[in-house]
Amino acid sequence: MRAREKERNCQNLWKWGIMLLGMLMTCSAAEDLWVTVYYGVPIWKEATTTLFCASDAKAYKKEAHNIWATHACVPTDPNPQEIELENVTENFNMWKNNMVEQMHEDIISLWDQSLKPCVKLTPLCVTLNCTDELRNSKGNGKVEEEEKRKNCSFNVRDKREQVYALFYKLDIVPIDNNNRTNSTNYRLINCDTSTITQACPKISFEPIPIHFCAPAGFAILKCRDKKFNGTGPCSNVSTVQCTHGIRPVVSTQLLLNGSLAEEEIIIRSENLTNNVKTIIVQLNASIVINCTRPYKYTRQRTSIGLRQSLYTITGKKKKTGYIGQAHCKISRAEWNKALQQVATKLGNLLNKTTITFKPSSGGDPEITSHMLNCGGDFFYCNTSRLFNSTWNQTNSTGFNNGTVTLPCRIKQIVNLWQRVGKAMYAPPIEGLIKCSSNITGLLLTRDGGANNSSHETIRPGGGDMRDNWRSELYKYKVVKIEPIGVAPTKARRRVVEREKRAIGLGAVFLGFLGAAGSTMGAASVTLTVQARQLMSGIVHQQNNLLRAIEAQQHLLQLTVWGIKQLQARVLAVERYLRDQQLLGIWGCSGRHICTTNVPWNSSWSNRSLDEIWQNMTWMEWEREIDNYTGLIYSLIEESQIQQEKNEKELLELDKWASLWNWFSITKWLWYIKLFIMIVGGLIGLRIVFAVLSVVNRVRQGYSPLSFQTLLPVPRGPDRPEEIEEEGGERGRDRSIRLVNGLFALFWDDLRNLCLFSYHRLRDSILIAARIVELLGRRGWEALKYLWNLLQYWSQELRNSASSLLDTIAIAVAERTDRVIEVVQRACRAILNVPRRIRQGLERLLL
């Protein structure tokens, strides 16, 4: 019984052992994944950075925008590159784009710098004694003058000279607010709130195209979708270093000299259902607007201080006709066609059947009229003739063919960007003024009202210049390039070898993101090229910025833009050094693919390697593990620190770290050299002692024997020599030769040393051969023993498996028999129910 019980216990142990072995084999079959660092991967994140500008300005042109652009911008790239990103979808939001804010600040800087060297009109903030201007009625009836002018006389501050000048009624206000109609005392409109600066007499403010560029380490993504509305995902994306040339045209209601839609008209709004939000319309065909100030007049120069002059319209005793009368003309057919398309588009978006365009409901002159700069004068044109029509799906009422003439007023004192405390006095321009522009967009607002109504009223808007820049920057966004990526691989770092080579330079910067739409496996193949393009782009941009900064330093006009360029230059180098510092901390300096000892945690991402490397892009992968990137970085750093400690302890053992180096050729040469030195030293000592011995004997009167004299060899203690009475063995004595002379002694010693070395070396070789023979024999026996043991255990495993299968089969059979027996009994019981009922009834009847 005990034997059977032990046998059963052994069988159970074998069963559990086989199960554990299977579990271990299953666990070992799962491949371990390790974190691998990649440098040069196409990954970016949304960012805010300092942009710099590029332009084709000419320093010899005295126009204000040219002067500003010469000082503030770098030259444009003669061969701009735009690289399409395949399989990339990116979200854009034109209403929350920091590029708009930066451009707004930059254009303010443009105007401020243009006005900086000009005269401040603080001495002109005095009382003006004004009367109505006497005009000659020579008008042709087509254009009516809407605003009167005042002929004013005043004394310049700190002077007694009385000056006469004409001012537009819009530029002056009566001092006595209670009696505005009959008042004769006036002041300039902005004297009590703003500092008025007179524009330089030769400034015309003619805008030139300005490109806004991202510094090195950053890129600008561009949406190339022709129907993109400014917000949401865009699947047709490219990367550029600079935007297209944007003309900083200051205007309201109508957008001038911008870009056109390539297909149909595009309506853009942050929230079209919110009537407070501005509606930006991008036309698909431009409409020419020609503005003219048809009358000439003269201007006078009044000295108001040391090297300071005020330019005004001559007022005293000079009849100049309708001075300042201006107008703009637009093709009625082109405007009618564009407005009809806008109405149709708005009707579809707002779900309205009738769209009515009406003039502005009121506000500042910049909002109620179309404001633009024409030849240096600021025109304020009445657009009520443009926005006065109704459009529906069946019929429309509006303009006929012909020309629409917009009456315009001219203001000399203009609020700059609606900023408190900033105003500009535009000096009068002599001669005729003509300018031609292209209407490429509209700024509109809607009245709102009942949502269930089928009617909607649209009015012109504007005033916030950010909307002007937004109409051009809607398709751009700035991103920060993150060239370091981590991903799981099967490779694990074994030994850290410190690399001293640096990553090379070459190619161009934009090619770095060219592989953004490729899978991770395809993109990782070109890491070296992409890393070189990253550094090359930094160097290329730094050279351009440095040239611009050097030019500013030469002109001694290093402005805010110069500081921005310095910031961009330093920022790019700092970002590159930061990435290199991270790679150095992780032990990955100079490497594009760097394995680590950090195991990949499936909680970060449980995707398979094939799914990661064959189906995902680097951007998709980065979004998936973005929450764990900081943790992975810290684990890599801790692993590298521990590895450096281990490496230090290993290096302290010095040459024991690698025993194989003992058998290198350099080591063998060193061994031979050491052997020769030892042999030479022994021979030298032998010679020295022999000479000293001979000299000592000669001094004692001893004469050396000849070379043929044989001396008896001392016998051992077991071989006694001949004694006095009984003779021993003498016939087999050996003798040694006593040499005489330095060279003979040297030869004898060298011969004996060689013989000694030969015998010892032979003995050593024989011993080594014997050891190798024994080791081989023992090793062979050990291999045979292991083979037999392996066969034995394999047989045992087979027997155990067979026994386990037999046991399982027997147990299954027994349980199956029991189940069958139970089923049979149940069936019999069911079948016997009628019989039992019958028997019971029979007993009851008996």
From Swiss-Prot:
<feature type="glycosylation site" description="N-linked (GlcNAc...) asparagine; by host">
    <location>
        <position position="236"/>
    </location>
</feature>
<feature type="lipid moiety-binding region" description="S-palmitoyl cysteine; by host">
    <location>
        <position position="827"/>
    </location>
</feature>
<feature type="region of interest" description="Immunosuppression">
    <location>
        <begin position="564"/>
        <end position="582"/>
    </location>
</feature>
<feature type="region of interest" description="MPER; binding to GalCer">
    <location>
        <begin position="652"/>
        <end position="673"/>
    </location>
</feature>
<feature type="region of interest" description="V2">
    <location>
        <begin position="152"/>
        <end position="191"/>
    </location>
</feature>
<keyword id="KW-0325">Glycoprotein</keyword>
<feature type="glycosylation site" description="N-linked (GlcNAc...) asparagine; by host">
    <location>
        <position position="179"/>
    </location>
</feature>
<keyword id="KW-1133">Transmembrane helix</keyword>
<dbReference type="Pfam" id="PF00516">
    <property type="entry name" value="GP120"/>
</dbReference>
<keyword id="KW-1043">Host membrane</keyword>
<feature type="glycosylation site" description="N-linked (GlcNAc...) asparagine; by host">
    <location>
        <position position="182"/>
    </location>
</feature>
<keyword id="KW-1160">Virus entry into host cell</keyword>
<feature type="glycosylation site" description="N-linked (GlcNAc...) asparagine; by host">
    <location>
        <position position="395"/>
    </location>
</feature>
<dbReference type="InterPro" id="IPR000328">
    <property type="entry name" value="GP41-like"/>
</dbReference>
<feature type="topological domain" description="Cytoplasmic">
    <location>
        <begin position="696"/>
        <end position="846"/>
    </location>
</feature>
<feature type="glycosylation site" description="N-linked (GlcNAc...) asparagine; by host">
    <location>
        <position position="452"/>
    </location>
</feature>
<feature type="glycosylation site" description="N-linked (GlcNAc...) asparagine; by host">
    <location>
        <position position="284"/>
    </location>
</feature>
<dbReference type="InterPro" id="IPR037527">
    <property type="entry name" value="Gp160"/>
</dbReference>
<feature type="glycosylation site" description="N-linked (GlcNAc...) asparagine; by host">
    <location>
        <position position="151"/>
    </location>
</feature>
<keyword id="KW-0812">Transmembrane</keyword>
<keyword id="KW-0946">Virion</keyword>
<dbReference type="GO" id="GO:0019031">
    <property type="term" value="C:viral envelope"/>
</dbReference>
<keyword id="KW-0899">Viral immunoevasion</keyword>
<feature type="region of interest" description="V5">
    <location>
        <begin position="453"/>
        <end position="461"/>
    </location>
</feature>
<keyword id="KW-0165">Cleavage on pair of basic residues</keyword>
<protein>
    <recommendedName>
        <fullName>Envelope glycoprotein gp160</fullName>
    </recommendedName>
</protein>
<dbReference type="GO" id="GO:0019064">
    <property type="term" value="P:fusion of virus membrane with host plasma membrane"/>
</dbReference>
<dbReference type="GO" id="GO:0019082">
    <property type="term" value="P:viral protein processing"/>
</dbReference>
<feature type="region of interest" description="Fusion peptide">
    <location>
        <begin position="502"/>
        <end position="522"/>
    </location>
</feature>
<feature type="topological domain" description="Extracellular">
    <location>
        <begin position="32"/>
        <end position="674"/>
    </location>
</feature>
<keyword id="KW-0014">AIDS</keyword>
<feature type="disulfide bond">
    <location>
        <begin position="125"/>
        <end position="191"/>
    </location>
</feature>
<dbReference type="GO" id="GO:0044175">
    <property type="term" value="C:host cell endosome membrane"/>
</dbReference>
<feature type="glycosylation site" description="N-linked (GlcNAc...) asparagine; by host">
    <location>
        <position position="606"/>
    </location>
</feature>
<dbReference type="InterPro" id="IPR000777">
    <property type="entry name" value="HIV1_Gp120"/>
</dbReference>
<dbReference type="GO" id="GO:0039654">
    <property type="term" value="P:fusion of virus membrane with host endosome membrane"/>
</dbReference>
<feature type="glycosylation site" description="N-linked (GlcNAc...) asparagine; by host">
    <location>
        <position position="271"/>
    </location>
</feature>
<keyword id="KW-1164">Virus endocytosis by host</keyword>
<dbReference type="GO" id="GO:0016020">
    <property type="term" value="C:membrane"/>
</dbReference>
<feature type="glycosylation site" description="N-linked (GlcNAc...) asparagine; by host">
    <location>
        <position position="87"/>
    </location>
</feature>
<feature type="region of interest" description="V1">
    <location>
        <begin position="130"/>
        <end position="151"/>
    </location>
</feature>
<feature type="glycosylation site" description="N-linked (GlcNAc...) asparagine; by host">
    <location>
        <position position="438"/>
    </location>
</feature>
